[in-house]
Amino acid sequence: MPHSDAIAASRPLNDQHAHVRTTFMARLKPGAHLLNGQCGMGEDLCWLRAEGYVVTACEAVLADAKVASQQSGQAVRVCPLAKMHSVLPYDGIWLSRPLDSDVSTLVPLLQQLATLLKAGAPLCFPLPPSGKISLAQLQQLVTTSGIALQLAPMEAVSASTSDSSNQHATQYVMLLRGDHQAT
């Protein structure tokens, strides 16, 4: 039985993120090896597997990792994103939750994630809904820190998690791994 058959088809895809997902997938080859970081309870993990990608998933919270594993039919590493290592670089990284916007932790984490990617590979994640870091601030941070990532062209995409209010809107950002190593 193919691994994707284990995915519960009854869960509807959260199509409020359809444009972001499509933009991310456009940069990938069929069967690409991806990291689904901070996978939560596995909604994005199931989506990525259903699209035919080989996915390594990690989640720091044991209870969430167990649910994600049950939902997806595959093992999920119980590991904070900052501790992830891989012998072979990934073709892409999709983060299911925002990164911490504190510069003292964000810079080293972005540097770490850059080392996990092949040259030109995408890293896609939601910005914190709190607005603590804007797209412009993130771009400046990446540029001035010498991180081997660059902002990818992607329309400003916001996905509201509530039809009646925009207070829960999530803006996604995509960075691409540069050809040079992080300094």
Region roles according to the model:
Residues S158-T183:
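Core SAM-dependent methyltransferase catalytic element
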Residues A82-I93:
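A short acidic, Gly/Pro-enriched loop at the edge of an enzyme's catalytic core
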Residues P30-G40:
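Conserved class I S-adenosyl-L-methionine
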Residues D91-T105:
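A short SAM/SAH-binding and catalytic strip from SAM-dependent methyltransferases
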Residues L13-G31:
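Conserved alpha-helix/loop element of class I SAM-dependent methyltransferases that forms part
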Residues V107-A119:
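A short glycine-rich, Lys/Arg-flanked "PGG" loop and its adjoining helix->strand segment in the class I
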Residues G120-P128:
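Conserved beta-strand signature within the Rossmann-like core of class I S-adenosyl-L-methionine
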Residues M41-K83:
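Class I SAM-dependent methyltransferase SAM/SAH-binding core
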